[in-house]
């Protein structure tokens, strides 16, 4: 089984490392415009792998042909979000990068599924889908899984125990919200305080250390695992919607079933209030796409 990563910076390389540690990988390919970085990270990963008696083929470089045969390609390349910058501020800067990456992936690894991480992630997921021409089950985005990890951490610290399900859905950004009707845990919490904490905690991490790294890496690993091991796990995922929840022609976070065919929207009922919030997220994202000519 082969994994591809476009972007060998901190999120891309840490995600590759997390997958290397936890999955049965035959090959990993790292592609980055900074060729030396990609080669160096590949070498470092290979040395780490040998320490746990794993010897997959690990390659790095700037040539997209390295991605050929990847079961799934994780795209983290793009300009990073800076302190004080919203995810949507990044849209104009990263849209051109994603458009170019989409073309190169299709030319070199047309059968691969694509997991988009580059922010603003929902907008970039839609652009990747549109520019690649791939079926919508093969292009999806990571955002709400990370938000949901943050939610679980906040819930636990607020007194929740045995957290069986806790999901954030909607935009990976300011209009995201807790799917309270689907939450399942023991104990009582102050939902308003918890939701407010989750909404702003990423900015706090960025303010203190410059970027979020470990949280995204684990979220990416969880989604990659579900695909390559065909687990069918339901994970909050940015999906291209074509009528689901009364939403069309936009990528937004909803519960999705992940497996060998990629991602498909899960048949899960939301409350009327949650559907309204989801449609609000979708409206905001559609407006951003229109500003970019999509």
From Swiss-Prot:
As recorded in UniProt, its EC number(s) are 1.1.1.37
Its annotated compartments are: Cytoplasm
Q: Which InterPro entries does this UniProt record tie to the protein?
A: L-lactate/malate_DH (IPR001557), L-lactate_DH_AS (IPR018177), Lactate/malate_DH_C (IPR022383), Lactate/malate_DH_N (IPR001236), Lactate_DH/Glyco_Ohase_4_C (IPR015955), Malate_DH_type3 (IPR011275), NAD(P)-bd_dom_sf (IPR036291)
Principal location: cytoplasm
Q: Which domain of life is it from?
A: Archaea
Catalytic residues per the record?
172 (proton acceptor)
A single GO BP term for this record reads:
tricarboxylic acid cycle
- For substrate, which residues are the binding ones? 81, 87, 119, 150
Provide a Gene Ontology MF annotation, just one: L-lactate dehydrogenase activity
Assembly:
Homodimer.
Name by which UniProt lists this protein: Malate dehydrogenase
Q: Which organism is it from?
A: Archaeoglobus fulgidus (strain ATCC 49558 / DSM 4304 / JCM 9628 / NBRC 100126 / VC-16)
Q: Which gene encodes it?
A: mdh
